[in-house]
Amino acid sequence: MDEDGAVMIPVEGGRRFKEMSVGKHMLNYDSIVVLTHFKGHAMGGFGGSLKNIAIGCADGAIGKKMVHAAPDNEDYESWLKGEPFMENMVESAKATIDHFGKRIVYINVLRNMSVDCDCAGVRAAPVKAHDLGILASTDILAVEQASIDMVYTSPEAELHDLKERIESRKGLRQLSYMNELKMGNDQYELITI
């Protein structure tokens, strides 16, 4: 989306950012489908639809740097594993979500989940949970909360490493901060189809 540059779009109600830099071509679309392989993530604790929007729609030259930038006086490794990074990701995603409004559908595929992100390639930890299902919603918080709830109610032996990764990186802050920013509803109903 950023082949021809970037544009700044507002982060409504943002505490960390007032605007986010996204790929210029995003303005050419009136809707978006977010198809996500839900899994662990080295920095985010877990990678769901929010992480994909936050990092995927932020442009490479400016937006991604905004999300990953720690204050000058912070130890970067500690900062990256804390709540401020999660809040940066949430606000980055909020800009895109606000831009599209109700014209977004989120699909989280909870299959072949590992503690590591797909970007780790062949170095990724082995798959522990093979198939928990596919969740879809037009509410970002509902689909992420339901995904996390399915992980946390799975047998401990299958997803212990993933739960540990989520907690060690403060990944659940993604959910609580989305709730604080009124980005969706953490109450949901699962409907089997």
What label would you give each PLM region?
Residues 1-193:
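Extended, low-polarity segments enriched in aliphatic/aromatic residues
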